[in-house]
């Protein structure tokens, strides 16, 4: 496995692979890798000739009061897991390598971001599409791999790819969970012992919402109330950042319960904000 920090060196290696007609699979991450990331790598390894993983904590997707400086980082750990998983290139650029100067052209996401994380984290998705635009140009992937846990991000990135004709196939992989149902996340390390015991209730509440919808319930307020009560069995209502149901991938009010629907939750603990979701009537790509 090559560890590359320079974008010019990355482009040269990618060009050689392209000239050899190799398909490239790309797994963009912010590092502190866990089983969820490695599941994406496993799919990339099976479906691509050459696998590139990026580890870059992107400052433009963090708000002024968010955890950019505190976000967990462990390059040695990441490199070990990446090599064991069969990654060919681990791209680990500095902030200066990706953002050498102040941007003269800025991307702004208009749709699919007025609710949930888009509303809760102003400017977050602008930063996501900005860094992915840069990375897609550098890596030129045939396939790019994302997890369903970040479903709103997936919808936004799908819009980016469609709007700007990126020649990349997005592969959306099911959320990887702990044995008790908690979605694997780099932020789980921030949980206290008590919070870690409580956190699986997020997934339990989402499963309850799915069960109600699939049984024919269409009273959205009732569904959300029952999910809220489920979470409140383990934690306090004040910790719920959002618990909502929208059409997917549009993130608009549900008008047709037979089409794509997302049930989404975000819960704030003392040092971690955890998100999770359930998708209904949605096929992963």
Curated annotation (Swiss-Prot):
Binding-site residues, (R)-pantoate: 61, 153
Molecular function GO labels: ATP binding; pantoate-beta-alanine ligase activity
Superkingdom of the organism of origin: Bacteria
GO BP annotation list: pantothenate biosynthetic process
Binding site residues for beta-alanine: 61
EC number: 6.3.2.1
Keywords annotated in UniProt: ATP-binding, Cytoplasm, Ligase, Nucleotide-binding, Pantothenate biosynthesis
Protein's cellular compartments: Cytoplasm
Reaction equation(s) it catalyzes: (R)-pantoate + beta-alanine + ATP = (R)-pantothenate + AMP + diphosphate + H(+)
Chain positions recorded as ATP binding sites: 30-37, 147-150, 176, 184-187
Pathway per the UniProt entry: Cofactor biosynthesis; (R)-pantothenate biosynthesis; (R)-pantothenate from (R)-pantoate and beta-alanine: step 1/1
Gene Ontology cellular-component terms listed: cytosol
Active site: 37
Function description: Catalyzes the condensation of pantoate with beta-alanine in an ATP-dependent reaction via a pantoyl-adenylate intermediate.
NCBIfam families: cyt_tran_rel, panC
Further information: The reaction proceeds by a bi uni uni bi ping pong mechanism.
Annotated family: Belongs to the pantothenate synthetase family.
Subunit organization: Homodimer.
Record-given protein name: Pantothenate synthetase
Native species: Listeria monocytogenes serovar 1/2a (strain ATCC BAA-679 / EGD-e)
The gene coding this protein: panC
